[in-house]
């Protein structure tokens, strides 16, 4: 669960070893780096025996305490049903230490994975972790290729089914012409950094997904799910390990009927101004600008709805204190996205009212 930035002390320590890395000194670096991270209490063993980093807020970790690998398996690999796909193409956003990619390969050795990560330090760390799946060696080899090539040492990984892009995921998606069956969306929480939760970024993801493709995220944030609906996804949810709220599954043109999200969230996404998505039309705004822009648009939307007599407080929406004709829509045999759009159309006369 990428809730925050990695701990600054951890990043400083890792950078120190990145400077002396030459490919031949991995064993020596492993011993010293892991020891130093543990001594500084920034590398933490989780309940499944795998390791994660402390986050910027030292009370938090970058993965759930139940286990970094366990989280990758039960929040991403298994819900994606990757084992049922032949030669699936996977987009692994915010790859971090590689746990999600490792789990995906473990459950489908024929997966073609595009890993995207902006933080070199967390990628570098995976070279020195002991992750109990043999597929870790594949990911390590691709990371090794990146760091050796960067310092001018020629090295070619044997694994052509893994691609690694180090940089802003927004720039990557604009240039990509691939179509994906599975997208692991493991970004920091939208409250902290909404950069990869905007309607505009998610729309680009949608365009690059195959029919029946699924995007999976640990986040169940209302603006995120609202943006997914506006992009055309059919949203669903599944119970999550280590968290009270479920993970989000978003399908493109599924040939089956996904389970619905809870009815309270359906109503809030359909009718509350807090469902207003983040926007980043140029795919280049800073996180602070994205947050500021949404706050401004939210106030304008609220004023508009009050003026036309269509403003409902989130509290009354959650309690179901809304017009009966709108409430009845939730009894219809539709998926969550269809229900949300129908409620908006009936109440606001505009299913796309939140895309300002």
From Swiss-Prot:
Gene3D superfamilies hit by this protein: Vaccinia Virus protein VP39 (3.40.50.150)
Pfam families: Methyltransf_30
GO MF terms, alphabetically ordered: oxidoreductase activity, acting on the CH-NH group of donors
SUPFAM superfamilies xrefs: S-adenosyl-L-methionine-dependent methyltransferases
Signal peptide (UniProt feature, chain positions): none
Xref: InterPro entries: MnmC-like_methylTransf, SAM-dependent_MTases_sf
UniProt-recorded name of the protein: Uncharacterized protein MJ0670
Protein's organism: Methanocaldococcus jannaschii (strain ATCC 43067 / DSM 2661 / JAL-1 / JCM 10045 / NBRC 100440)
